[in-house]
């Protein structure tokens, strides 16, 4: 087995004689296997749920467990392994709280607005469709373009994040990871639609939850007394200080940026309509809110601990620095599975969301002849 020469993210890793945690062949096999497993599961499950209603809104019949795991899995992409960890090293506890609240806030917003939109437009499938019918076509195309652009950028960021992660662990070329993940996800998502996305989200969230618990527990136990607010305060008191101005500016910036963009996430609005009733939607959103908050906060705290232990560590690699300090191959394999599960759960949501907008809003946008199959065009 092979190990990296250092964990600092410094230039040494850019030398020709890199040594990694995993061999490229091992990581490549794992990427292919994990991607294929989710693709086969999605394709097999969605065979019995065909039709436009299942593709767009899962026939409006999703229960509490499936809806909750899907909402959380879709919200938590591979970015959680990098973003909050890095932000905590310069923005302190305020950045972490802002990140967490920004990610979870849409769940609270959807409790109230979700009820209204389901009541006013019970047969809908998207926020943009609702806005077009409620307020006219004046801003419709602009909002549609902005929504698709945001989700496309989100999709690119997710695929890039997991590709960078696996490159860091094994040296696998970025395009190889990205291509495998995209092809497998597109295959089952464009075939099975929202049904396939939600079903695979359920499995992915179970995998994500178990692996996060294991990996964070390992970090906590191996760090000992260093895994505490007291240790962070002794090394970098500004990160926990109420008088540290960047903590407020960073927190507010992250909250506004993350919350505002997620409110236009079509994947969330599809799930609002997919819930079998409003009570299921409400409980699911509340549970999702209280699952997301501690996960983001824990990742941010890990970033502060890592930075306090060694300020020379590249900020976005803090999670891996603490976890892989003993250079364990098994942990590297677990990280690959975690990263792929986080990414695929988010990417399938984004792919189906973008596709659904073409189906739902395509007629009003392109105005083709009445026999046009917008579902086929979207695929």
Task: Annotate each language-model stretch with its function.
Residues 97-189, 257-258, 339-349:
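Helix-loop-helix module between adjacent transmembrane segments
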Residues 40-48, 152-159, 172-180, 184-190, ...:
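Hydrophobic alpha-helical segments and their helix-loop junctions in multi-pass secondary transporters
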Residues 56-123, 256, 268-311, 321-342:
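Membrane-interface helix-loop-helix modules in multi-pass membrane proteins
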Residues 17-82, 189-192, 205, 211, ...:
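Membrane-interface "cap" regions at the ends of multi-pass membrane proteins
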Residues 63-71, 105-108, 137-150, 179-181, ...:
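Select transmembrane alpha-helical segments in multipass membrane proteins
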Residues 137-141, 152, 356-379:
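Loop-to-transmembrane helix boundary motifs in multi-pass membrane proteins
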Residues 145-156, 207-218, 249-263, 278-308, ...:
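Selective recognition of specific alpha-helical transmembrane segments in multi-pass small-molecule
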Residues 124-132, 193-202, 264-294, 315-318, ...:
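Hydrophobic, small-residue-rich membrane helices and short re-entrant helix-turn-helix hairpins
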């Amino acid at each position: 087995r092979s190990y990296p020469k250092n964990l600092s993210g410094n230039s040494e890793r850019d030398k020709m004689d890199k040594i990694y945690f995993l061999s490229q062949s091992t990581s490549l096999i794992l990427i292919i296997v994990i991607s294929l497993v989710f693709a086969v599961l999605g394709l097999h499950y969605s065979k019995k749920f065909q039709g436009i209603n299942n593709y767009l809104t899962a026939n409006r019949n999703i229960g509490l467990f499936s809806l909750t795991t899907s909402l959380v899995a879709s919200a938590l992409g591979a970015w959680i392994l990098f973003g909050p960890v890095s932000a905590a090293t310069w923005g302190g506890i305020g950045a972490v709280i802002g990140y967490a609240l920004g990610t979870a806030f849409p769940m609270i917003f959807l409790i109230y607005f979700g009820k209204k939109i389901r009541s006013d437009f019970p047969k809908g499938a998207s926020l943009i469709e609702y806005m077009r019918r409620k307020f006219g076509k004046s801003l419709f195309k602009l909002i549609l373009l902005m929504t698709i652009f945001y989700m496309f950028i989100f999709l690119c960021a997710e695929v890039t994040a997991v590709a960078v992660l696996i490159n860091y662990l094994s040296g696998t070329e970025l395009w190889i990871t990205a291509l495998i993940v995209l092809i497998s996800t597109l295959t089952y998502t464009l075939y099975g639609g929202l049904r396939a996305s939600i079903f695979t989200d359920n499995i992915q969230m179970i995998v994500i939850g178990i692996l996060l618990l294991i990996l964070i527990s390992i970090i906590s136990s191996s760090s000992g007394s260093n895994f505490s607010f007291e240790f962070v305060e002794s090394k970098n008191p500004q990160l926990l200080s109420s008088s540290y101005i960047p903590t407020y500016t960073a927190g507010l910036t992250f909250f506004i940026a993350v919350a505002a963009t997620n409110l236009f996430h079509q994947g969330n609005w599809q799930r609002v309509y997919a819930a079998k009733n409003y009570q299921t939607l409400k409980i699911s959103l509340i549970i999702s809110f209280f699952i997301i908050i501690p996960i983001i906060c824990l990742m941010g705290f890990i970033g502060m601990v890592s930075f306090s232990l060694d300020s020379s560590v590249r900020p976005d690699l803090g999670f891996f620095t603490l976890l892989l300090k003993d250079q364990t191959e098994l942990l590297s394999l677990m990280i690959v599975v975690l990263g792929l599960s986080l990414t695929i759960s988010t990417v399938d949501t984004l792919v189906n969301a973008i596709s659904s907008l073409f189906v739902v809003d395509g007629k009003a946008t392109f105005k083709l002849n009445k026999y046009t199959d917008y579902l086929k065009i979207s695929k």
